[in-house]
Amino acid sequence: MLSFLPININIEGRRIIIVGGGRVGLHKATILARFTDRATVISPEFREGFSQLPFTLVRKHYEPSDLDGAFLVYICTEDALLNRQIKRDAEARGVLASVCDSPELCDFTSPAIFRKDNLTVAVASDARDVHRSMSIRDAIRDNFDYLEAHSHDARSLYHKH
């Protein structure tokens, strides 16, 4: 059974790569854009929407050297064999890899995220029930104003001890 440790990773100044310019790659890139404006997306073709993101778009087929100097890579192609090869290339270079839709190959997964100002709420299911994670994240988002308004009660209790 897969077991993922929920952590926050400092990506400041780190090289992040997304391989794949389709629907899944665009989804990952859109989320990533909330946290950084520095990433490179590699794909022979790009779905509409990529041009609105702050990332460098490289229109070409993947090559192993694309991972040189990278910190992490999101592998989002529609070719399962290519995804496995990119994962092997990442391992050989010590690059953390997330293979979209293949959690058994992932070094990390991305939780369902809600972010407001400097607060980030992440809900994960160890890649077993993504839709449930998203539903819980949505419930938190939909009730956030109420929760935030009452958080001062929790803060005052915390500071008393």
Locate each region found by the language model.
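Alpha-helix C-terminal capping/helix-to-coil transition sites in glycosyltransferase folds
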Residues: 12-13, 68-70
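Residue-level detector of alpha-helix initiation sites
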Residues: 23-24, 80-81, 127
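Hydrophobic beta-strand scaffold residues
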Residues: 39, 57, 94-97
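ADP-ribose/adenylate-binding Rossmann-like module
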Residues: 72-76, 83-109
